[in-house]
Amino acid sequence: MTHPVITAARFNEAGLIPAIAQQHDTGEVLMMAWMNAESIAESLSTGQVCYFSRSRGKLWRKGESSGHVQRLVEMRLDCDGDTLLLLVEQTGPACHTGAHNCFFRRVTKDGLEEIA
Amino acid sequence: MTHPVITAARFNEAGLIPAIAQQHDTGEVLMMAWMNAESIAESLSTGQVCYFSRSRGKLWRKGESSGHVQRLVEMRLDCDGDTLLLLVEQTGPACHTGAHNCFFRRVTKDGLEEIA
């Protein structure tokens, strides 16, 4: 049976919806990636976050190779159904660069600077 | 002069980039909307967040009619340049429904439930 969140979600033309991952207990915004109906269903059934990789064109089980998995604590759908918020428990760094989150470039008056 | 964040940003085919708004002092994720080069430049110069409304096809100065403005505290660009994180000071509710943030629908085992 299709979970109601998949019915309510407004996917884009590629069948994808943006998903924001946030560390559930600290509020740290970790990353934003994309999900399709299949990856939402898998995330809900396994409790481990699974995205859809646009570059590889296939499911992306977060941490499958790195071990940097995300346990799904809670999933939320926004008011108009076109964005998901995933409250997660992140193991290790979330970013493929090794940074704890992906938002480590701060915009300054005239440039970008890396923050820890 | 074009700000380096606009040069570094990877806009989609419609010239847009997703932007996550987060209350800077509480970590509450408020909403996700879209920005283009022009709205990024205006946000940086005025210090008030300006998005691009896809449905109306024009700049959307957040709170222009409702007064629910977002003062831009800090802007960050993610590791691969395709998502922005906006740390903001939100005045009033962020969501057009009047909810404080847009993520008020929690996914349950078999449905969606509204949370305060």
Curated annotation (Swiss-Prot), chains A, B:
Its EC number is 3.5.4.19. Its main location: cytoplasm. GO terms for biological process: L-histidine biosynthetic process. Mg(2+) binds at D78, D80, D82. One of its GO terms (cellular component) is cytoplasm. Zn(2+) binds at C79, C95, C102. GO terms for molecular function: magnesium ion binding; phosphoribosyl-AMP cyclohydrolase activity; zinc ion binding. It is found in: Cytoplasm. It is an enzyme of class 3 (hydrolase). Its cofactor is Mg(2+); Zn(2+). It holds the Pfam family PRA-CH. Binds 1 Mg(2+) ion per subunit. Catalyzes the hydrolysis of the adenine ring of phosphoribosyl-AMP. NCBIfam families: PRK00051.1 (NF000768). Belongs to the PRA-CH family. This is Phosphoribosyl-AMP cyclohydrolase. It comes from Acidiphilium cryptum (strain JF-5). The lineage of its organism: Bacteria, Pseudomonadati, Pseudomonadota, Alphaproteobacteria, Acetobacterales.
